[in-house]
Swiss-Prot record:
Sites where the protein binds FMN: 61-65, 85, 139, 170, 211, 239, 263, 292, 313-314
This protein's name: Dihydroorotate dehydrogenase (quinone)
Active site: 173
GO molecular function, one term: dihydroorotate dehydrogenase (quinone) activity
Disulfide bonds: none
SUPFAM superfamilies attached to this UniProt entry: FMN-linked oxidoreductases
Residues the record lists as binding substrate: 65, 110-114, 170, 175, 240-241
Length: 358
């Protein structure tokens, strides 16, 4: 029913500032009765991290920062949901306004600054869903004023790993000063070693993933993928939002706002980086493709570039939750048209071409 209501609600939501509209959406989802997700085409199933994903279409971090509506989101048909980002201590993030729509570009700019209710609140909610169906992961970061950011990631891992299927180490948000410095090889090596050790000490089997910035140079990507392989990282999420502003943006006045750009204009940049990442790691580290997915064609391109799973968020602002089913149906049709019974043969098959042309 929520799919059918979105076209009616969209003008009302878009008449509000973007953050208020989002807060109302979260509130509305929290009021929905429990709903089993629709059955998925068996050809869309993906085995990854020791988990059976019913379909490859996930919700990216940032939508449900407080882990308040993960089950409602799974009920909309997502194959998995990533909650967060979460930091140890509650923090308000940057001053409002801090999120901006670019409707003609089908894009969003945000500078939230990892606003978070903190580790205790999110851990309690994730613990409370123990035994429920559905794959939920969590994105973790560091407090803006932290004296020891590495310790922040360790604290989040130790507390949250027992309650999730995967933990995504976020060192690529552009909205926390100095956070991307942790992508440097020496810092990253130490960080990942500590996070993996904290996961192991917790007794959890949660996979540890690393989220990459789209603005990284290829030399930096070489170092980052080598570090991820060395430290046994089980997945790479490609990519976060970009600080770049493509010349093609129509909403030029809004484009001047600082923050990370997501949505359709990020598609080419993030898909090229995804393909470049696949060319470096192949099947040794599974990839999750994120950035500009707003159709089955875009999701298919991410898979051809090397993604086993995909995530979206910004497109929901414009297309609503019905987009999830539209993408899944489109992927199923593609597989049937090619006579395939799974997505596995498609993963990375065009990575070399897409690294050049996306």
């Amino acid at each position: 029913m929520i799919d059918a209501l979105f076209p009616l609600a969209r003008p009302l939501l878009h008449g509000l500032d973007a953050e208020t509209a989002h807060d109302l959406t979260i509130r509305g989802l929290s009021l929905l009765p429990p709903r089993r997700p629709p059955a998925d085409d068996a050809s869309l199933a993906v085995e990854m991290f020791g988990q059976s994903f019913p379909n490859p279409v996930g919700l990216a971090a940032g939508f449900d920062k407080g882990a308040r509506v993960a089950d409602a989101l799974l009920g909309l048909g997502f194959g998995f949901v990533e909650v967060g980002g979460v930091v140890p201590q509650p923090q308000p993030g940057n001053p409002r306004p801090r999120v901006f729509r670019l409707p003609r570009d089908r894009a969003v700019i945000n500078r939230f600054g990892l606003n978070s209710e903190g580790l205790d609140a999110v851990a309690d909610r994730l613990k409370a869903r123990a035994g429920r169906e559905g794959i939920v992961g969590v994105n973790i970061g560091a407090n803006k004023e932290s004296a020891d950011r590495l310790a922040d990631y360790v604290a989040c891992t130790a507390r949250l790993a027992p309650h999730v299927a995967f933990i995504t180490v976020n060192v690529s948000s552009p909205n926390t000063p100095g956070l991307r410095d942790l992508q440097g090889e020496a810092f990253l090596d130490d960080l990942l070693a500590r996070v993996v050790a904290a996961r192991d000490a917790s007794g959890s089997s949660a996979a540890v993933l690393l989220k990459i910035a789209p603005d990284i140079a290829l030399e930096g990507l070489d170092a980052m993928t080598a570090t991820a392989l060395r430290r046994g990282i089980q997945g790479l999420v490609v990519s976060n939002t970009t600080i770049a502003r493509p010349s093609s943006l129509v909403e030029s006045s809004v484009a001047k706002e600082t923050g990370g750009l997501s949505g359709r204009p990020l598609f080419g940049l993030s898909t090229r980086l995804l393909a470049e990442t696949y060319l470096r790691v192949g099947d040794r580290i599974p990839l999750i493709g994120v950035g500009g997915i707003d159709s089955a064609e875009a999701a298919w391109a991410k898979i051809r570039a090397g993604a086993r799973l995909v995530q979206l968020y910004s497109a929901l602002v414009y297309e609503g939750p019905g987009l999830v089913g539209t993408i899944k149906r489109g992927l199923s049709q593609r597989l049937r048209a090619e006579g395939l019974t799974s997505l596995a043969p498609v993963v990375g098959r065009d990575a070399a071409a897409l690294a050049r042309d996306a």
